[in-house]
UniProtKB/Swiss-Prot annotation:
Organism per entry: Xanthomonas axonopodis pv. citri (strain 306)
A Pfam family that the UniProt record links to this protein: AdoHcyase_NAD
Protein name as annotated: Adenosylhomocysteinase
Location (main, coarse): cytoplasm
Coiled-coil stretches: none
Record EC number: 3.13.2.1
GO MF terms held by the record: adenosylhomocysteinase activity
Reaction it catalyzes: S-adenosyl-L-homocysteine + H2O = L-homocysteine + adenosine
Annotated family: Belongs to the adenosylhomocysteinase family.
């Protein structure tokens, strides 16, 4: 599609349709009521503005809930530029509502990969009063794309030849082409970006995995906070969020009756647990695939059959990948599936399913049914339905997680951004997790909304347990 672009002395944006702003604002108002943690943090810091004039780039699904996060960061002082972290996840009315307030946002549903990475660069590009192009001081990342781009750009300026190596995928080729272009158009740009960059907070399992890989290689340029492994993120967003949004995505995409169907959930981490619970709640017969014996045992103890993908071919109706790994469902698996099986992903990247290999098959007919629903017909007459082109089904085919559970995640993100900035001179170039007392505080902020009343320890009880009356109540090694 053709995005609407506007550049003025005060704001710039690339979105689908600015006329959707009023609709977006109405939904924002509803979401704020459902996001008590985020709104409480906004009220607490509205006067002190701990992020005053701090340049923040966000790369995170441009949804209504994210719009509430953006406005929270702005209300506590930040100078924000935003892009989505997925080509299909933007809610265009949410992007319009944010653009209408003067916040630069670069996102629309249905971007090409070239447009997506251009939008990421736009969100990264701040202009100083003297006209110099620079980057953010803090980053809110989801999947690690901004972190990857800055690191690869900086390495290129310091002698890396990675951009000249053959690309392993179409998307990698797009990234390399972008970096080559920036090298010509903005000499020394990435060095200026890194000089001012103070930290990143990462939302997802996939992005955190990238961060640890970079850190283990000794190449991490900044301190990073692993928001994903906060208990109030991973055990809520990943688990309870997926429990509601997976079925929502499947039903909006296919109008399918889940009861009685055989559904395969690939992976039984927190996302897999939520996905399996979602399908079982509707009456599906769920089979789990796993590599980890602990997760496999957990799934079995919950009553799920645990087996291999190969054992399900020809009998399963629905496949859902949740792993964060690549090549979980291969093109050979796709060709051997039951006729008209539904295939989707609720992990992060589309490489969990071999989508590129599917598209490259000879004599395969692709039929677009509606946006984000494609039917692939094989030469033998059998077909599969691929949802959201192998990207996130809950955001590509529906609206993602509900506001309340995202309030947990985004409260963590906001606290992480404040902590990174206030302690920017003490953090080392490592990956950190938010301290336990902040994790408990995020949970506490959401209790009143759902009518929860906490029991209070006596001083004697607290002394017996060796904790403070006000918490934290669990050691860091405790597994919830």
């Amino acid at each position: 599609m053709n995005a609407v672009t506007k550049i003025t002395p005060h704001t710039d944006y690339k979105i689908a349709d600015i006329s959707l702003a009023d609709w977006g604002r109405k939904e924002l108002d509803i979401a704020e009521h459902e996001m008590p943690g985020l709104m409480s943090i906004r009220r607490k810091h509205a006067q002190t503005k701990p992020l005053k004039d701090v340049r923040i780039t966000g790369s995170l699904h441009m949804t209504i809930q994210t719009a509430v996060l953006i406005e929270t960061l702005k209300d506590i002082g930040a100078d924000v530029r935003w892009a989505s972290c997925n080509i299909f996840s933007t809610q265009d009315h949410a992007a319009a509502a944010i653009a209408a307030t003067g916040t630069p946002v670069f996102a629309w549903k249905g971007e090409t990969l070239e447009e997506y990475w251009d939008c990421t660069l736009d969100a990264l590009t701040f202009t100083l009063p003297d006209g110099t192009l620079t980057g953010p001081e803090l980053v809110v990342d989801d999947g690690g794309d901004v972190t990857l781009l800055i690191h690869k750009g900086y390495e290129l300026e310091n002698g890396s030849t990675w951009v000249d190596e053959p690309a392993s995928s179409h998307e990698e080729g797009v990234i390399k082409a972008l970096l080559k272009r920036v090298a010509v158009e903005r000499p020394g740009y990435w060095g200026r970006v890194v000089k001012d960059w103070k930290g990143v907070s990462e939302e997802t399992t996939t992005g955190v995995h990238r961060l640890y890989q970079i850190a283990e290689a000794g190449k991490l340029l900044i301190p990073a906070i692993n928001v994903n492994d906060s208990v109030t993120k991973s055990k809520f967003d990943n688990l309870y969020g997926c429990r509601e949004s997976l079925a929502d995505g499947l039903k909006r995409a296919m109008d399918v009756m889940l009861a009685g169907k055989v559904a395969v959930v690939c992976g039984y981490g927190d996302v897999g647990k939520g996905s399996a619970a979602s399908l079982r709640a509707y009456g599906a017969r769920v089979i789990v695939t796993e590599i980890d014996p602990i997760c496999a045992l957990q799934a079995s103890m919950e009553g799920f059959e645990v087996n291999t993908i190969e054992s399900t071919l020809g009998r399963a109706d629905i496949y859902v990948t949740t792993t964060g790994n690549k090549d979980i469902i291969t093109v050979e698996h796709l060709q051997a599936m039951k006729d008209q099986a539904i295939v989707c992903n609720i992990g992060h990247f589309d490489n969990e399913i071999q989508v590129d290999a599917l598209k490259a098959l000879k004599d395969v007919q692709k039929i677009n049914i509606k946006p984000q629903v494609d039917k692939y017909v094989f030469p033998n007459g059998n077909a599969i339905f691929l949802l959201a082109d192998g990207r996130l089904v809950n955001l590509g085919c529906a609206t993602g997680h509900p506001s309340f559970v995202m309030s947990n995640s985004f409260a963590n993100q906001t606290l992480a951004q404040i902590d990174l900035w206030e302690k920017r001179d003490t953090y080392e170039k490592k990956v950190y997790i938010l301290p336990k007392h902040l994790d408990e505080e995020v949970a506490r902020l959401h209790l009143e909304k759902i009518g929860v009343k906490l029991t209070t320890l006596t001083k004697d009880q607290a002394d017996y347990l060796g904790v403070d009356v006000a918490g934290p109540y669990k050691p860091d090694h405790y597994r919830y």
